[in-house]
Amino acid sequence: MKFLTSIWTSIALIVLFLGIRVLDPSFIEQTRLNTFDQYIKSLPDKESDVVLLNLGEETLANYGQYPFPRHTYAQLISDLRNANAGMIVFTIMFPEADRFGGDEVFISWVNNNGIILSQDASSRGRSDSAPYVGTATLGEGDAYDFVPEYKGLVTNLPELETAAWGVGLINSKKEVDNITRRIPLLSQINGQLYPALPLEVIRVLQDKKSYSLKADYDGIKDVMIPPYDPIKTEYDSSIWLNTNYTHKEYEYGYDALPNLNGQTVIVGLTASGLASQIPTPQGLFSAQELQASALQTVIDGTSISRPQWTGLAEIGLILIGALLIVSSIYYLSVWIGAAVFFAVVSAYSILVWYFWTSSGILLDLSYSIIVYIISFASSAFNNFYIQFKLRQQIKGQFSTYLSPDLVNQLVKNPELMVLGGERKEMTFMFMDIIGFTPISEAYKEQDDPEGLVELINYYLDTMTK
């Protein structure tokens, strides 16, 4: 039992929790992601420059059964051009020929008309290649070692992709809880790098022929499209999304389109039962709403990142903070340990908030605080248990030999017990108790010498007060 209440037990507990953090099971990762969600939700709400054109229930009522004939999409492009739209982006894909024979008209409206189409990287994709834009790699790393790899593509009709100004992927990064928080800016299929849809939109807007990226041995650092600042990414080219945007939305065939003043328009399906809803920390998003948030995140230069060093830094800070808490309790006192605990928690929280507000770097607050609390609670419990057992031991050893007042003094302050005794000025009182012999003999006959000691202590206490 003595070992279980020693400092080594608390240290072993810290090592156990550090081991769990290194293994990083799914429930720990989920807790961390939920914490990051709260950080991102703290960002101020902003109005996006991207306009959404939805194909919803009213659109179906006006244009009939979905999928629409391609000449309907040609008319949609015409209406957007009359509304002075800028870049027109489709999150709808057109992999098959139109059963109504409207492909030729649609292609003519897509051709050289500021249209960007979508692709989907998938293991079930029937294509293993598509038109792509070259990528220049800077640095000593190989991007192909880090970006997500897929076996196939869901593409559009080749004539459409040739006519469009750009084509981008609409994939997101798979999370442990299936909530979309990140998208990879680059993916590889059949040995080629393909851009995400937001990246392709920016390239076309800037009239650039290619991208450039920087990669080191530990992953991709950033993706660049001048004149924008480098887009900071995670090691696999993923970026965190700011979903705190509000977008102007119109339903095609129902809402009158205003003068769009050259704004980028993303077209997508929202009709119930046809459109898939994407779970995000802010709720369910449509495909075009998610892509609009991703595009606006990049345009605004919102830097949300979790560099690879953050995990190691968190483990180191957990170790240092927990050891400070445990040591202060065992070697000083519980009250000093409580002060150290609050100081460590406050300092770590300030550090996390500083990195987030100044650089957009995500440091996990939740797991560290949990370990600090458990370290403090276990050490404080051990300390109280040790003190409790010591008081019990003092009472058991001295209650039959010393007066209750003196025993209570020793219980409150065990340091009063000094080996070898101590020097004090003392006053002695000699007395003779009348009838003491028969009293002591009575206790002897009752086999209760302790009772006699208790009686004498009571008598002497009363006489000396």
Question: PLM ranges: what are they?
Answer:
Residues K2-D229, L260-V334:
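Non-transmembrane functional regions of envelope-associated proteins
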Residues N34-F36, K248-G253, N408-N413:
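Short gly/ser/thr-rich secondary-structure transition/capping motifs
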Residues L213-A256:
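Substrate-access "cap/lid" subdomains that shape
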Residues S293, T297, A322, Q392, ...:
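Feature representing long, continuous alpha-helical segments
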Residues I304, Q308-N382:
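Transmembrane alpha-helical segments that form the functional core of multipass membrane systems
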Residues I373-P404:
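Juxtamembrane or sensor-core-proximal signal-transducing alpha helices
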Residues T400-L419:
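Cytosolic juxtamembrane regulatory segments of multi-pass membrane proteins
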Residues V418-K465:
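Catalytic NTP-binding/metal-coordinating core of nucleotidyl cyclase/transferase enzymes
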